[in-house]
């Protein structure tokens, strides 16, 4: 098994973003049977969304399945200390049922934790709007000429909230997966992740910042590919949920890789 210091040297040689893309592609395509089973699984989940009364339930199930798989692959990555060759061998032995059920309880509690965090963010957004309203006299309930300004403020805050979620959740997830053992751990570690000193160090790592930019660009490309595929090539619509999962997997795997990089670097010293 690769030592922490060897892992650091590997990051230096490959660049973190390249290593993240390698791990991501190994996860999705190294085991052909697993790839086929994942496509079938997300195609079946897609049908749940076609039933109106099942939409809320389908959304919850989709989140739990996503987290079950991503937690499993992340734990596998941590087990081999970032060694790509060992990770390949582990993926080749992986079965879908094993990946789904191993951390299913953890995925359920983590899903509820993300919901709780999102509600907290929405409350923060609402409070921010109230404060802005008191300062400027312009609220989302403003009518007349100030309505456009109020609407723009609301949109800007929503965009800030959205980008905060998609950039912070993978890092919160990483801290949770690295330190958590029980389903209860996963719930509380995720909710307290914003106060973790280790995660704040990511903001001062140039390697992490540069790699996150590259991964973000690649993730945007996947999203655009999914959009084009679903709208211009209807016969391939059944693949869209698998593509969406692959995008989520990339973002969260990178979160795990970047946080573990800092930990292994500290251990190497």
Swiss-Prot record:
The chain crosses the membrane at residues 21-43, 48-70, 121-143, 147-166, 205-227, 242-264. The keyword Coiled coil does not apply. GO terms for cellular component: plasma membrane. It is a multi-pass membrane protein. Its main location: membrane. The keyword Transmembrane helix applies. Keywords: Cell membrane, Membrane, Transmembrane, Transmembrane helix. It is found in: Cell membrane. Coiled coil: none annotated. This is Uncharacterized protein aq_1793.
